From Swiss-Prot:
Protein name from the UniProt record: Homeobox protein LOX2
A single GO cellular-component term on record: nucleus
Main location: nucleus
DNA-binding keyword on record: yes
Stated role: Sequence-specific transcription factor which is part of a developmental regulatory system that provides cells with specific positional identities on the anterior-posterior axis.
Alphabetized InterPro entries for the sequence: Antp_homeobox, HD, HD_metazoa, Homeobox_CS, Homeodomain-like_sf
Record organism: Hirudo medicinalis (Medicinal leech)
Length: 118
């Protein structure tokens, strides 16, 4: 392969670049082309580097959320044997309906029956 076809090495980002990218991700998980161009000029990165950073960051978030859900399911299974008889039918229905949502609260919060909103 000629020099144009060689694979590029892994990009390392400065703390400042990472901080700015994380701040942007917090507000926008997806960037418009215009915003990507602005960031590339501000952070001295290419548009492609920014695009790939955001793709990787979204995948990291997806994996983290999935891991938390799996841990919550394990905890629900463990606690189900001890607290299964203490659950009312409405709390079981509520937990199963909300299990696919974005809430990442521990399962004990769902079983308490009281919330700060009440």
């Amino acid at each position: 392969p000629n020099s144009n076809q060689r694979r590029r090495g892994r990009q390392t980002y400065t703390r400042y670049q990472t901080l700015e990218l994380e701040k942007e991700f917090k507000f926008n998980r997806y960037l418009t082309r215009r915003r990507r161009i602005e960031l590339s000029h501000t952070l001295y990165l290419t548009e492609r580097q920014i695009k790939i950073w955001f793709q990787n960051r979204r995948m990291k978030e997806k994996k983290e959320v999935q891991a938390i859900r799996e841990l919550n399911e394990i905890e629900k299974t463990k606690l189900g044997g001890f607290l299964g008889s203490a659950r009312s039918p409405s709390s079981t229905t509520s937990a199963s309906c909300h299990g696919t949502g974005s809430s990442l609260s521990p399962p004990l919060m769902e079983m308490g029956g009281h919330s700060s909103a009440e």
